[in-house]
């Protein structure tokens, strides 16, 4: 099958198509992980994006449902140097997702690093793609909106409340689902925290009706500036019970506290991002997947920076300056402590969330 990747600047990259025979548009990004293609493809945060893998060989260890981070592939397309094994090809076909292999992924990655993330089109076809078709495809890419103009969260958030019960429940949280990864839910449930997953646009009254011990705002795709409903809910929740966040949830909390976010040139996507804990000086290798960040020049009033990225000094965590009253506790991280894929250096943060919930539960009982 023929494959073609068309970039907004008119660049045409031809290769071998695999997966579904179709055509998709999206923001072209790169991921530096050496493993974890199943988790990456099924991560809801990749909605609206075509993912290029910098590691050259993909598909060599198959596909298993237990590795899924959602109910199916959420990335729009997949770009690899070499694809091996039928399972990856069949996996993409099952979810009607195109892939292209046999292309210079180093060239693509350098281009993204130099120019920034790029609007692109990926087309696969059993018939050769003509020069006349190329012209039409370039036109489609140029007319495609920037990802910040697309409201992606409604496409990946749960439509109804879902409960994940811990066998030995120690605490309970409401998870505001902006496109949560299953690994996040698993990390909480394994630690004795029951999780009530609610839609991104749930209101304060509904959330409090579940009597949670804390709230977690999840990861997800797109620009946090599009999340006005969720931001308002988080504003109203702060001061009522502890609030935490991961990735997009971190950005939403930043805005809710009065801070600002901005779009990164090419984002952080991979399993090898070094993050420094400012207070302790410890460094953790983290898994990341984001294209927006907290503006360190507009730190929310009454808050402080918690973690920083050692590669580019961007903000990786903030917290509201601590109060003796647990209901005022607010903290969030930009990276993914659950990994999936990636190192587990930061999974202790789920222990801290659960401990926070247990303490607040006890405080409420007194």
Curated annotation (Swiss-Prot):
Transferase among keywords: no
GO biological process: 'de novo' pyrimidine nucleobase biosynthetic process; 'de novo' UMP biosynthetic process; glutamine metabolic process; L-arginine biosynthetic process
One Pfam family this sequence matches: GATase
Gene Ontology MF terms: ATP binding; carbamoyl-phosphate synthase (glutamine-hydrolyzing) activity; glutaminase activity
Chain positions covered by the region annotation CPSase: 1-168
Pathway this chain belongs to: Amino-acid biosynthesis; L-arginine biosynthesis; carbamoyl phosphate from bicarbonate: step 1/1; Pyrimidine metabolism; UMP biosynthesis via de novo pathway; (S)-dihydroorotate from bicarbonate: step 1/3
SUPFAM superfamilies on file: Carbamoyl phosphate synthetase, small subunit N-terminal domain, Class I glutamine amidotransferase-like
Binding site residues for L-glutamine: 45, 220, 222, 248, 251, 289, 291-292
Keywords: Amino-acid biosynthesis, Arginine biosynthesis, ATP-binding, Glutamine amidotransferase, Ligase, Nucleotide-binding, Pyrimidine biosynthesis
Reactions it catalyzes: hydrogencarbonate + L-glutamine + 2 ATP + H2O = carbamoyl phosphate + L-glutamate + 2 ADP + phosphate + 2 H(+)
Enzyme Commission code(s) on record: 6.3.5.5
Catalytic center residues: 247, 336, 338
Gene3D superfamilies with a match to the protein in the record: 3.40.50.880, Carbamoyl-phosphate synthase small subunit, N-terminal domain (3.50.30.20)
Enzyme class, first EC level, given as a word: ligase
CDD domains attached to this UniProt entry: GATase1_CPSase (cd01744)
Domain Glutamine amidotransferase type-1: 172-363
Oligomeric and partner information: Composed of two chains; the small (or glutamine) chain promotes the hydrolysis of glutamine to ammonia, which is used by the large (or ammonia) chain to synthesize carbamoyl phosphate. Tetramer of heterodimers (alpha,beta)4.
Function summary: Small subunit of the glutamine-dependent carbamoyl phosphate synthetase (CPSase). CPSase catalyzes the formation of carbamoyl phosphate from the ammonia moiety of glutamine, carbonate, and phosphate donated by ATP, constituting the first step of 2 biosynthetic pathways, one leading to arginine and/or urea and the other to pyrimidine nucleotides. The small subunit (glutamine amidotransferase) binds and cleaves glutamine to supply the large subunit with the substrate ammonia.
Family stated for the protein in its record: Belongs to the CarA family.
UniProt name for this protein: Carbamoyl phosphate synthase small chain
